């Protein structure tokens, strides 16, 4: 299906007409990732029969690597930027794509894709965790809903303590812009769901305390949560219908997500399963939202029961079915073993910084690898010592319409890396010099791209296949 409805190679749209033409034009990078994860799960279950998903997998992986890491829309379809839930799906999908390539004997493609996934994983906290939280006493460091970044900004501010988030659907006259560091949701739980972070991780647990303090709704059926603070998509405060503005209510879907986390943490998830069942309508349908205030019998609105929101919400039903299976089997069904093996079991990964046209990183850490990654063949004209020695390196091609050059940064490197491009197909110079400054670990700003606290290696294996730099004077 993903092959049939993706008008842009590798992109799976949210919805489409019966002839396959996309209806909504917005792109969510998590929805590019999901078909890859599904394909791998079906492959592992030996359920693909004669269908070969690899062309779709290659296209989707290429799209994620060319257009990420900022997503045009996150899972709530409202904002662009660095989203913990979107990044989690991308890391998982790219790991699955690497597994597909490895099984086909394409070791170089597998290494390249996996290294991009590692790059995303190593930047997760520096992109999406504030250190200036104000929502819960004594918890300053926690995940935020999204760090807003415009996808057409080639020099984004990647400090999650900065940025203003526009909240959609606010009532006329209401404040609509808030500090992004003060807006939270539970999307970071996807990191645990897929096997990228451990349940019980102190940062995850602290972030949950913040979420519970501002989003949790306790009902006779069990706990539920609103999407994010200041959400305005839902039944109005007076009980009237949503007509372009309103008040975000509790979403049963999020109860299912929390149930999966509690199971992963070794706790009883049954109460969350029963809560979901209690939120259903009399006909057994799960709503998008339920009424989370005192009963309004005159409007047929009852605490803990469906509002006038979409019913059934298939997303919520899918979450319920997966939670039911997970509870029955005693483990989270959505966890991908290959992802967990990569990120939960102490394996060393590469320390990689990536410069590309849509993310022209300003600085890299000494002792790591700087990858120059673009979408056309090139020769890189570069120096590590202010042009005392000049290097010209031909880019390495990949199977994903991506070309790259790796520069190993010595631990003692101090001078900035300066470079420009000679475009091979067009036989022309770029005409612009670019600079990446070098920062050392002792002074490296944690709000800029860096490695996470897990162990890291140094040079990526794939860099060994690139042509050697040629020194020119």
Where are each of the predicted segments found?
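Aromatic-rich carbohydrate-recognition surfaces in CAZymes
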Residues: 1-68, 84-87, 91-97, 313, ...
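Extended ligand-binding clefts on enzyme/binding-domain cores
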Residues: 2-21, 85, 103, 110-253, ...
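Acidic/His metal-coordination segments adjacent to aromatic residues that form catalytic metal sites
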Residues: 10-25, 65-82, 165-173, 299-306
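C-terminal capping/lid segments that line or modulate ligand- or cofactor-binding pockets
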Residues: 14-17, 24-31, 35-38, 178-198, ...
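Short, solvent-exposed segments of well-ordered alpha helices
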Residues: 23-26, 51, 55, 77, ...
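Structural helix-adjacent loops and short alpha-helical linkers that scaffold large soluble proteins
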Residues: 42-58, 98-117, 195-209, 262-274, ...
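Alpha-helical scaffold segments in carbohydrate-active enzymes
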Residues: 56-66, 89-103, 112-130, 210-213, ...
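Glycan-association/targeting regions that enable binding to alpha-glucans and other polysaccharides
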Residues: 335-473
């Amino acid at each position: 299906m993903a092959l049939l409805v993706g008008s842009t190679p590798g992109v799976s749209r949210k919805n489409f007409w019966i002839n396959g033409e996309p209806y909504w034009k917005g792109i969510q990078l998590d929805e590019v990732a999901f078909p890859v994860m599904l394909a791998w799960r079906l492959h592992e279950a030996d359920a693909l029969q004669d269908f070969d998903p690899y062309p779709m997998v290659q296209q989707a992986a290429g799209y994620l690597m060319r257009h990420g890491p900022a997503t045009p829309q996150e899972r709530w379809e409202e904002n662009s930027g660095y989203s913990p839930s979107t990044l989690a799906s991308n890391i998982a999908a790219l790991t699955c794509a690497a597994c597909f390539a490895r099984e086909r004997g394409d070791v170089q493609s597998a290494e390249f894709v996996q290294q991009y996934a590692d790059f995303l994983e190593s930047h997760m906290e520096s992109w999406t965790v504030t250190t200036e939280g104000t929502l819960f006493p004594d918890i300053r460091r926690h995940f935020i809903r999204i760090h807003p970044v415009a996808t057409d900004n080639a020099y984004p501010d990647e400090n999650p303590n900065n940025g203003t988030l526009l909240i959609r659907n606010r009532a006329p006259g209401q404040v609509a812009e808030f500090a992004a560091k003060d807006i939270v949701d539970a999307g970071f739980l996807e990191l645990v769901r897929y096997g990228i972070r451990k349940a019980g991780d102190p940062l995850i647990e602290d972030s949950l305390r913040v979420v519970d303090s501002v989003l949790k709704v306790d009902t006779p059926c069990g706990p539920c949560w609103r999407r994010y603070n200041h959400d305005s998509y839902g039944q109005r405060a007076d009980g009237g219908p949503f007509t372009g503005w309103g008040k975000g209510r509790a979403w049963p879907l999020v109860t299912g997500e929390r149930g999966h986390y509690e199971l992963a943490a070794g706790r009883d998830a049954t109460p969350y399963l029963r809560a979901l069942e209690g939120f259903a309508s009399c006909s057994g349908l799960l709503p998008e939202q339920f009424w989370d205030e005192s009963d309004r019998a005159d409007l047929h609105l009852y605490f803990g029961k469906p509002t006038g929101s979409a019913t059934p919400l298939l997303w919520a039903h899918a979450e319920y079915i997966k939670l039911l299976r997970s509870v029955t089997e005693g483990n989270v069904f959505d966890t991908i073993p290959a992802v967990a093996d990569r990120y939960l079991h102490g394996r060393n990964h590469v320390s990689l910084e990536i410069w590309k046209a849509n993310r022209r990183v300003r600085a890299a850490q000494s002792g790591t690898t700087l990858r120059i990654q673009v979408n056309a063949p090139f020769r890189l004209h570069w120096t590590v010592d202010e042009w005392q020695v000049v290097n010209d390196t031909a880019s390495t091609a990949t199977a994903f319409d991506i070309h790259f050059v790796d520069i190993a940064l010595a631990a003692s490197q101090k001078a900035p890396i300066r470079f420009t491009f000679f475009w091979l197909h067009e036989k022309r110079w770029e005409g612009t010099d670019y600079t990446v400054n070098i920062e050392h670990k002792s002074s490296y700003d944690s709000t800029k791209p860096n490695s996470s606290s897990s162990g890291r290696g140094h040079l990526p294996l794939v860099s060994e296949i690139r042509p050697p730099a040629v020194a020119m004077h």
